[in-house]
Amino acid sequence: MKIAILGANGNVGARLVAEALRRGHHVTAVARRADSKADTAQLTHVAADIKDPSLPAKLRGHDAIISSIHFTQAQSDDLLALVRASGVKRYLVVGGAGSLEATPGKLVVDAPDFPAIYLDEARAGKTFLDVLRGVDDLDWTFLSPSALFVAGERTGHFRIGSDTLLVGSDGKSWISFEDYAIAMLDEIEQPKHLRQRFTVGY
């Protein structure tokens, strides 16, 4: 498959690139700073902002686009316009945990002890998800990580959920970037959450 990854230089984006290449896919890695000298037969780097008028043409013909960009750094309208202009129907979003339910009817982001430093990003992520839920012309998927989202090991062992924060038997809610990337690529290869949000955790 041909997969384009927006925000390919970030913590999550880099793991998504690595996982896609590991599975033999052809990857277009899009970032504001990209080195075409690092291109290979499987990997093409594109230096572009999401508003770059030349970007839609470079994404045309891909099987899927993954957006791994902070919600406070890009407007949903701009991202959706880019995907639509590219003609690619499969659109996957690296989401946040804030929009998950901690308990029925209570979102993680609304908890009194939610870290203030992440508040704007979490609220923007919830808004983005709300916008996506009204989109019916793209085959979108929004994948939320667990509360703690960090570098770790690629184990291949994790749980999948829907709209509720996953918490382990040890009381912790977390997932590594590496295992998150596995869940995202699994969804691309075998779609099970079209026009849905799902979550991943241990």
Map each language-model feature to its residues.
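Glycine-/Pro-rich loop/turn segments that contact NAD(P) or position catalytic residues
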Residues: 71-158
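NAD(P)H-binding glycine-rich loop region in Rossmannoid oxidoreductase-like domains
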Residues: 35-86, 192
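C-terminal substrate-binding/catalytic lobe of Rossmann-fold NAD(P)-dependent oxidoreductases
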Residues: 119, 126, 134-202
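N-terminal Rossmann NAD(P)H-binding glycine-rich loop of SDR-like oxidoreductase domains
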Residues: 3-22
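Short, polar loop motifs at secondary-structure junctions
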Residues: 29-36, 147
